[in-house]
């Protein structure tokens, strides 16, 4: 028998899969009101915080701006860019990649025509990009990046020095969740009939399975709320101030990143000895480094991404006191 002050926890979790991309996740019982409290929080996280992959920059041969038309191609550039946004990409161990499409002659250009490596998947290869007429030709380079939520092109700062000539910035919708809704129904436990059943109806693009998306959203919510469970009072004035804590990963030498000898030597020549030094540099700054080109830069970015880091990060209190440089 449950006491009057004890909170119910969901004991039943059911997954009803309509397809590999569409499922309903049903959880019960919840105390009255908790279905809406948790359902709304999970829905917002699912829509805004799932990691996905999207085109962010496109360069089309012979095209200067997005309002152009291409001879021999039925769609104009705006339509081609919209079609590219509908492709579901999945990358393994990479934060960004440059993909190419090259096709000529009458026919349909689909996502399956994109040249990808072993570490990149196109999950909907039949998705149509454009239609070519007789004598038509389409050559493109597509930059794919990892991200979360929606990011308009105007919000991304891309240096003109590193941006390819004729490339077009694209509004990026990274979220792998196409649609999510929740409903709260009545549930019953023994004599109690005022409880909630939470039903989350979710559809993804295949980059992440519906159930895994819900699990990830729940972990994010728990992580964000856990800080409130450890609230402490304001330290007394007599206590000595604590020195800022620095992530031990940032104190490791760049040699630990296992970069090529060329890349590592270029960094050290710029007095970049620690990972904390490196992540504060921007792409533009690194490209100004003698003998460090785009290939080395991409290598550095991929290695940092595998550790949850990126270039251009801001660190307070760096370097920490007592840090000895070679």
Swiss-Prot record:
The N-terminal domain is essential for RNAP assembly and basal transcription, whereas the C-terminal domain is involved in interaction with transcriptional regulators and with upstream promoter elements. This is DNA-directed RNA polymerase subunit alpha. GO terms for molecular function: DNA binding; DNA-directed RNA polymerase activity; protein dimerization activity. InterPro entries: DNA-dir_RNA_pol_insert, DNA-dir_RNA_pol_RpoA/D/Rpb3, DNA-dir_RpoA, RBP11-like, RNAP_asu_C, RNApol_insert_sf. Homodimer. The RNAP catalytic core consists of 2 alpha, 1 beta, 1 beta' and 1 omega subunit. When a sigma factor is associated with the core the holoenzyme is formed, which can initiate transcription. SMART domains: RPOLD. The lineage of its organism: Bacteria, Pseudomonadati, Pseudomonadota, Betaproteobacteria, Nitrosomonadales. DNA-dependent RNA polymerase catalyzes the transcription of DNA into RNA using the four ribonucleoside triphosphates as substrates. It comes from Thiobacillus denitrificans (strain ATCC 25259 / T1). Residues 1-232 are annotated as: Alpha N-terminal domain (alpha-NTD). GO terms for biological process: DNA-templated transcription. GO terms for cellular component: cytoplasm; DNA-directed RNA polymerase complex. Pfam families: RNA_pol_A_bac, RNA_pol_A_CTD, RNA_pol_L. It catalyses: RNA(n) + a ribonucleoside 5'-triphosphate = RNA(n+1) + diphosphate. Disulfide bonds: none annotated. Residues 246-326 are annotated as: Alpha C-terminal domain (alpha-CTD). Keywords: DNA-directed RNA polymerase, Nucleotidyltransferase, Transcription, Transferase. Belongs to the RNA polymerase alpha chain family. Its EC number is 2.7.7.6.
